[in-house]
Amino acid sequence: MHLVGGGLSDDDTPLLARFLSEATTRATAAARLEPARVAVVLVHDGLGAEEFDRYAAALRSAGACEPFAVLAPEGGSFAVAQLQDVDGIVVGGGLTPAYRQALEPVFGEIRRQVTAGVPYAGFSAGAAVAAETAIVGGWRIGDVEVVQESASEDLDEVTVEQGIGLIDVAVDVHAAQWGTLTRLIAATEAGLVEGGVAIDEGTVLIVGEGQLVVEGRGSVWSVIGSETGVTVSSAGAS
């Protein structure tokens, strides 16, 4: 599983290299003759085709593959049939509550496929909703501001909802750029989540069977709760 702390940018193609390698391995194991089929899952506000073209170009720059679009408008939802016969799943960035709502009908299917070995890459919203307990937005807890309002995702109160369930800790994104590390710290202290990771833009956290791997130009911040408060640490690319 590959969790990227921001939406796709022009500098992010290298972050897709290991994901695409895993998808290619999956295609080979399935005896697929054509390149790896990668579902690009996007929730959009009218520019879905243009956004898909950006992701498809980045994937093809990272290696041979066959990206295909799985699109839903904000307020819509996805169906299990749209995610069949895939070697990799990319979930893009955008309004996190809209992504969570659209993906909810296929949470179980995505978990099933990832368990079966299909690699998952989430950018921004796609990383946040990968968690079992997902922070979908908000900038205040009660009357206390915990992050800048511009990071609220159109929500007032910090909101935690069921996510896909690919990782058992919360994930926040745009950590250094939007200051969302403080939201994760506050949510942990308030007992909304049991801890988690906050990922910088341009940075990917790779979660697999072995040791966690960080790649890219930023850091991944780990927040662990305890009876006496929280512990925060960071890790960069090694």
What does each model-identified segment do?
Residues 65-80:
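A short, well-structured beta->alpha microelement
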Residues 90-92, 114-135:
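Catalytic nucleophile loop
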Residues 11, 99-100, 131, 138:
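Glycine/Thr-rich phosphate-binding loops of Rossmann-like dinucleotide-binding domains
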Residues 37, 87-88:
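Structural motif
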Residues 96-105:
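Glycine/threonine-rich flexible loop motifs
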Residues 83-84, 114:
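A short, aliphatic-rich alpha-helical micro-motif
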Residues 1-33, 40-53, 57, 61, ...:
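C-terminal and late-domain segments of enzyme folds
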Residues 91-97, 169-171:
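Short, basic, glycine/proline-bearing loop/turn elements
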